[in-house]
Amino acid sequence: MKVGCIGLGDIAQKAYLPVLAAQPGVELHLQTRTPATLERVAAVHHVPGERRHTDLDSLLAQGLDAAFVHAPTAVHPEIVGRLLEVGVATYVDKPIAYELADSERLVDLAEERNVSLAVGFNRRHAPGYAQCVEHPRELILMQKNRVGLPEDPRTMVLDDFIHVVDTLRFLVPGQIDDVSVRGRVENGLLEHVVLQLGGAGFTAIGVMNRLSGSTEEVLEVSGQDTKRQVLNLADVVDHKGQPTVRRRGDWVPVARQRGIEQVVLAFLDSVRAGKVLSARDALASHELCERVVRAVQEQGA
């Protein structure tokens, strides 16, 4: 199976390539416009010269079965569009695009061409989060915070807060019928945002504070007098009277802990099986992000 990796930035190098390069039966091709990066990364993963590409045309000429897109978000629409047009099953790091219209167009194109389009919502596959589906979830709280990093609202929401939005959508136990958004925008930069989702018998709250003094990610699900916390995607604390802690094993790879290994293997399995994946549900997370962006822009105006 010929698999291309487009864009060789930090996330591709640290999380995706170690998984892809280890898969038997995968002929890995790399593409980036930066020759020095291409040579260095290819050498690390023993990718021979004929599988190293500095332009998309050269890569597409190889007759790919699947592609992973880790290029900057701004160029996603062009790259993903070309891949889908020629029938290549495509996995794109979130978001599909910064603008909802572009995301909608690409999801429609994938369905028209009957080609898989998968979006990198790895947290759905992270063991600590996936297991929360089995826990009472009358109240869901998720925080993903950073230090000293206010940002343009659209960039922050689509590049980062989208993880919170999608995780809440994944975990809510019923249909969402109420959405509210609060944010603080100073000098055009979003400092914090709070999203509250409600439905029959449940409330889900997502928080991102870019001036929090701490880089952290905390998920809590609770109900029926029990609570589960997942700290930084690693440690799981169950509360029912006394807390019990399950720590990540010392030898568990980060890619597995964060759900990246699992989402990659699930995508490759679908390609091998000829199963077409739809990004329609992922698009719903993008639509909710658009509501968040517009709400905080109005509040900051």
Describe the residue ranges of each PLM region.
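Hydrophobic residues in well-ordered beta-strands that form the structural core
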Residues: 12, 92, 117-119
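NAD(P)-dinucleotide binding in Rossmann-like oxidoreductases
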Residues: 201-265, 275-278
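Rossmann-like dinucleotide-binding domain that binds NAD(P)(H)
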Residues: 148-216
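A contiguous active-site-proximal alpha/beta segment in oxidoreductase catalytic domains
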Residues: 97-149
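N-terminal Rossmann-like dinucleotide-binding module
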Residues: 1-46, 268
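Beta-loop-alpha module in the N-terminal Rossmann-like domain of NAD(P)-dependent dehydrogenases
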Residues: 45-91, 95-105
